[in-house]
Amino acid sequence: MFPDQLSLPKEDSVMTQGAILDGIGSRIGLTFDELFERYNSMVFGLAYHILGDREEALDVAQEVFLAIYRKMGTFRGESSLKTWIYRIAVRRAANRFRWWNRLRRRGTVSLEEHLSKNPERELARDYTSKAQSPEDALLRQEEREEVKRMLNELPLQQRVAVIMRDIDGLSYEEIAESLNVSLGTVKSRIARGREVLKHHLNGQ
């Protein structure tokens, strides 16, 4: 489920939201509305798993689609549309993550403190079905929190690769293309990240 708060970019442009995208629409036959509907959950999910905060992920997702809107003419079809969008999303989310880390190093608020002081901003509540029992809902929330905690233990590059492979289900080739790194680098990052997660799961 994708949050309702994310909306299409509002920019002054000769291209309306229903118009075919220059450079993208001409190749794949999608309007911007259709592209947004197809990829918004993917972009938000990636940003959320990297950042761990609903509002931050919403902000990043807005930035991503605004960037797509502005850069639509640069898409040449040399990669798949999905990996092109992933590349933009990873870059934006990673930049936001590094920004939080810089604040932490300066002695200002950390992302972890921000989350703990704003629990109502967690996405977990949006994924909890009203049909669930309170016990099941609590268990699912605890499981999500544990996954998020373990992912937060990974270095950023490993975290991104593991998320793209094990959560989003991308192939190694798609990840390599999205991150603009070699296939061997992708496999190494995922293997190392999984090893760290395995140690955490085993309580080591």
Region roles according to the model:
Residues 1-42, 49, 128, 135-136, ...:
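N-terminal module of bacterial RNA polymerase sigma factors
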Residues 25-26, 65-80, 99-101:
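Sigma70-family region 2
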Residues 38-41, 49-52, 163-173:
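Short helix-capping/turn signature of helix-turn-helix
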Residues 45, 59-66, 79-91:
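Structural recognition of an alpha-helix C-terminal capping motif at a helix-to-coil junction
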Residues 74-76, 90-119:
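Arg/Lys-rich amphipathic alpha helix in sigma70-family domain 2
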Residues 77, 97-101, 154, 159, ...:
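Short, Lys/Arg-enriched C-terminal cap helix and immediately downstream tail that follows
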Residues 116-149:
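Acidic, proline/glycine-rich intrinsically disordered inter-domain spacer in sigma factors
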Residues 145-185:
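Helix-turn-helix DNA-binding module
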